[in-house]
């Protein structure tokens, strides 16, 4: 929900409240697609690691039902995104972000390039909003999205780091290890804060 909230706030700089809600809803549907497809792809590993917090592992939903749900929500995300203020150009960028996130789920999470989809997907979000409004996002906003998203990547893997290593899911944080990942995350977050502060001081 954090991504959706940020989307709404950022959209309000360019669009009305109702239009911003429309855009945020399109992004929310995209987030569902990414999260559910990740659960589907990771199911064998999640089951082996006994992650009962996952619906598929807990058997609260079947794989076939989840596949159908992903298809329906993906189509809904496309239609709503196209008919929202994002239009064709913003939707194209939105779906570039979804494609990047899917590439992470499918393959890149297990490579040294694991942070790249975070850079692409979250860096694309402000572009989708601003391009749809007929302008381009300030550099500091894009940079902030990239820095904070990258920091999140290094922190987000920590809870499953040991089981990831056991299952040979060797993304960049897993290769670097827990301590280095925490340090890098703190550095990136610090740079993100500095970016926001300096940009607003100049304003």
Where are these regions (language model features)?
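Multi-pass alpha-helical membrane architecture of UbiA-family
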Residues: 1-203
């Amino acid at each position: 929900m954090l991504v959706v909230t940020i989307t709404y706030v950022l959209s309000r700089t360019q669009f009305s409240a109702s239009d911003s809600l429309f855009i945020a809803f399109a992004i929310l549907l995209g987030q569902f697609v990414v999260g559910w497809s990740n659960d589907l792809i990771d199911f064998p590993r999640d089951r082996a690691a006994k992650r009962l917090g996952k619906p598929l592992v807990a058997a609260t939903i079947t794989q076939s039902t989840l596949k159908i749900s992903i298809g329906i929500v993906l189509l809904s995300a496309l239609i709503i995104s196209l008919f929202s203020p994002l239009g064709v150009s913003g939707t194209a960028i939105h779906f570039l972000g979804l494609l990047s996130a899917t590439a992470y789920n499918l393959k890149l999470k297990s490579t040294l390039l694991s942070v790249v989809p975070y850079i692409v997907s979250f860096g694309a979000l402000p572009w989708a909003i601003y391009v749809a409004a007929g302008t381009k996002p300030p550099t500091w906003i894009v940079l902030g999205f990239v820095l904070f998203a990258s920091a999140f990547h290094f922190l987000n893997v920590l809870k499953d780091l040991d089981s990831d290593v056991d299952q040979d899911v060797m993304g960049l944080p897993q290769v670097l290890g827990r301590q280095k990942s925490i340090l890098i995350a703190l550095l990136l977050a610090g740079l993100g804060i500095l970016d926001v502060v300096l940009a607003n001081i100049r304003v």
